[in-house]
Amino acid sequence: MVKESQENEIKSICNNTIIDPSLGEGRGGYLIGAATSNSGKTTFTMGLLRALRDRGLKVQPYKCGPDYIDTMFHEIASGRESVNLDTYMASDEHVKGVFKRYGEDADVRIVEGVMGLFDGYDKSKGSSAEIAMLLNIPVILVVNAKSVAYSVAPLIYGFKHFNPKLKIAGVVFNMVASENHFSFLKQACEDAGVPCLGYMLRNHDLIIPGRHLGLTIEAREETEELIGLAAKEVEEHVGWPLPPPSPVEREPIREREQIKEDKVSIGLSPSGSLPTEGSPMLITSEYVKSGGRGHLIAIAKDSAFNFTYRANIDALRELGEVIFFSPQSDERMPDCDLLYLPGGYPELFASDLANNASMRDSIKAFAERGGRIFAECGGFMYLCNDIDGIPMCGVFPFSATMMDAKLHLGYRQLAKDNCQLSIINSQLPKGHEFHYSSVIEPDTLPEGIRKEQFQLSAKGQAVDTALYHYKNVLAGYTHWYWAETGFAELLDLFKCKDTEA
């Protein structure tokens, strides 16, 4: 009776909600797409997430592609950690499994797309449209209506008919000037044969002012205000209810093949003690299967370092206990077997990081005595001598700089021919690069530092993105996705030819 009462309550809520009332285990969701970037899909997504949350629904957010910032917005709006879905960095089966796994207890899933709906790394490969079709969920298309009226009709018609396998649930217009303006847009939608779901008025307070929102308490308050305004727009101007989402078929989630018969190098001693430099650092597959109890994995997490994938962190939990710490405010790094320094914006908080000398010294000492460190992008910058003259950890004798900033952007994969594939049939890990900074190396690298350049772009072209080794420290600009391939396997594959393990 209690369960029936709860279901009736949900159905009552949904009678006036954007989501179909027939909720329950295994529900599907919607993908929020757009004709182009900067159409307002993030603003609409935040408003939709908050509006649904305010109605008492459990909403699981997702983000297409490798983006870290939008997932932070999602978490603030929904109260649930957002999950990335990327068909370049992971297989279709893995993406479907992640979509189902993290939304098991949700009433509805909302996926925010990336760029234009059909934009991918190779035509539409890896695009939002590809993910929507893979997951069998309909698309809510956000169209920027600034400076346009009835001319949106052929655009909408084209998106509806370009790929018949893609379901367009309807259109939401953004940057609408007035109700009269909306009347022209609504007529265009009807003539294009696509439902018009509503609109969001042109409001400069709804424009996201920068990509750094959500990183500080002050910025989070600003984000909360923006989300509240967006939710109000959704409540007032988006039609209720929307077409029902597609159900997710209940098929077993394929477990990733992280357990191998061979031993895999992870840089942790089976006893859980800190390995000394030069000692064998192997962990057996049986130990991984047992959960790696006794191993501590410390992850930097604060305003300066927060670019992580939820599925990656859960994969690390398979290897041991995960603990978080703040390089900005904690006195020193925690005792651990593996230190993970993810990306973020250390350049924005360089003074705070520099002022915490005890933390920097503890990380440098950990590296010097053979501690295992894995650092990506902003974490790599933190390990350099300095960021534009502001002192950092000094593990690598490099200077990180934002001077002459140039965007380095793109997917990355390992060059198979250059890597020692000690794990037979293992899927090569992939990742992405996104940064404006650069590192200035000395003319000659000091003894003990190795520089490896064995990464390719999504189209298989060699790139100069490097990976640096010092003792048991592995660092570089690429953000890697190991939730499918496994973190132990990732480190094992970084053993390259002509280098020592």
Task: Indicate residue ranges for each PLM-predicted region.
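A short helix->loop->beta-strand "cap" motif at the edges of active sites that frequently abuts
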Residues: 137, 194, 368-372
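Amide-donor transfer/coupling interface in amidating biosynthetic enzymes
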Residues: 206-249, 253, 283, 287, ...
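Cysteine-nucleophile active-site neighborhood
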Residues: 346-419
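Structural motif
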Residues: 31, 110-112, 140, 172, ...
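Intrinsic disorder/low-complexity segments
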Residues: 1-28, 246-293, 416-428, 496-501
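Internal gly/pro-rich beta-alpha loop/helix module
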Residues: 150-247
